[in-house]
Amino acid sequence: MSNRQYFKAEALKHRHTVLRKLLILMPVICVALAAFLTHVFFAVDGYNWWYMGMYPGFVALVCGTICEKEKKMKNRAILALPCDMGRVWDAKVLYGILMSGAAMLLLVLLVLAVAFILEHVLNVTFIIRPSLFSQLEAGVLLWLSFCWQIPWCLLLSQMLGRTVMLLVHFVLYDVMAIFCPYLFFICYFRGRSEPE
């Protein structure tokens, strides 16, 4: 079997799950909240809310749902198949990356469309107005910077279960978001105080 067939099997397995609903629902909720709550900072806040809260949750839920299918049967169905387990894992990771990329693309398109409506139809003046290129670039960079979390969350979900993985993922993400600026601050002064 080729890698394409493994990927098709993974996509077919998740065809009637909650993933496609989440793929549409989470970006729509994020854009709607940003549009209603912060009119003049809409484009910036749409991305900020997405990468600080909604996108990590989306990635964790996608990975938990991907692993949940086999975990229900204790991996007996997939272990009995005459297939390469490495390719099965690669197909899961690739499917998770594709789902996260589709969600990011939908968010970028929604932010662009709603920003156009707010600016040209409702005459809202944005305080910060990112260009089209910078918004597309932000979407690509956000997607690429989150791709490493998909194998990590799949591994945690496989080992610990979906609920524990969600808790560990959110706690680690929030702790790193809080302490990361201070770590750079400490490293900056430590490097500057050394004699030359």
What does each model-found stretch correspond to?
Residues 13, 78-80, 157:
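Helix-capping/transition residues at the boundaries of transmembrane alpha-helices
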Residues 44-46, 63-81:
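Transmembrane helix boundary and interhelical loop/hinge segments in multi-pass membrane proteins
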Residues 24-27, 92-93, 169-170:
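Residue-level recognition of transmembrane alpha-helices
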Residues 1-24:
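Aromatic- and glycine-rich beta-strand/loop motifs that create alpha-glucan
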Residues 27-65, 94-162:
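Secretory targeting signals
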Residues 83-95:
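Amphipathic cytosolic juxtamembrane alpha-helices at the membrane-cytosol interface
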Residues 18, 22, 87, 164-165:
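Residue-level recognition of membrane-helix boundary sites in multi-pass small-molecule transporters
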Residues 38-47, 127, 133, 166-196:
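Terminal transmembrane helical anchor/hairpin motif
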